[in-house]
Regions:
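A detector for small-residue-rich transmembrane helices and their helix-helix packing motifs
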Residues: 1-193
Length: 193
């Protein structure tokens, strides 16, 4: 299994997976409150200058299902980006989308959230737009995957009983799309010059 995981993932993909797993195990083995207090989105006066908080909330997960699904999508989508483009590009998308999706979620519902799903939706948005505008890069997503993820996004908004960071998902998707629009425009400009 590790060979398969490593074959698809670069160092950033693997590092984020390992960090998420370590943090999850710390949370499960009695350090949950301390870990959350250290890593949650900046909610209190002065925390906005603790810059790690703008992205570290994406490393928190609150159930086995939560972390497994997020890490599988991260590995699948992030691994493709890192292998085809670069580790720097994946890190850029992670940092920008974690900060923006976290800010959106905080603005709407406060700081009681965590998880990689806002970033996962950014990866989806990035691959969707980049695959459409620059198919020669080989980063196209199958339409059923895009459809499934968009339906899942909508379902998050229409069911009131589960704690889902819907705003983080939406802002993540939009931030990934925006980065892809910028990158694809730059790609097309470089091809014409």
């Amino acid at each position: 299994i590790m060979g398969m995981v490593k074959a698809k993932a670069g160092p950033v993909t693997l590092l984020i997976m390992v960090v998420c797993a370590v943090i999850y195990f710390l949370q499960m083995f009695g350090f949950g409150d301390g870990v959350f207090a250290l890593l949650h989105f900046p909610a209190f006066e002065g925390q906005q200058w603790q810059l790690w908080r703008w992205v570290s909330h994406a490393l928190l997960h609150f159930s086995v299902t939560h972390i497994v699904f997020n890490l599988l999508w991260w590995w699948q989508l992030g691994g493709d980006i890192e292998r085809r483009l670069s580790s720097g590009k994946l890190l850029q998308i992670f940092l920008i989308s974690a900060a923006l999706s976290g800010a959106g979620q905080f603005y709407v519902e406060g700081a009681n959230f965590g998880g990689l799903s806002g970033v996962v939706y950014a990866l989806l948005g990035y691959l969707w737009i980049l695959g459409y505008r620059c198919p020669h890069l080989g980063l196209t997503l199958p339409k059923p995957i895009i459809g499934f993820m968009l339906v899942w996004l909508v379902l998050g908004y229409v069911q009131p009983f589960m704690a889902i960071a819907n705003t983080a998902h939406l802002v993540g998707l939009l931030s990934g799309m925006a980065i892809a629009l910028f990158d694809s425009g730059k790609q097309k400009y470089q091809q014409t010059s």
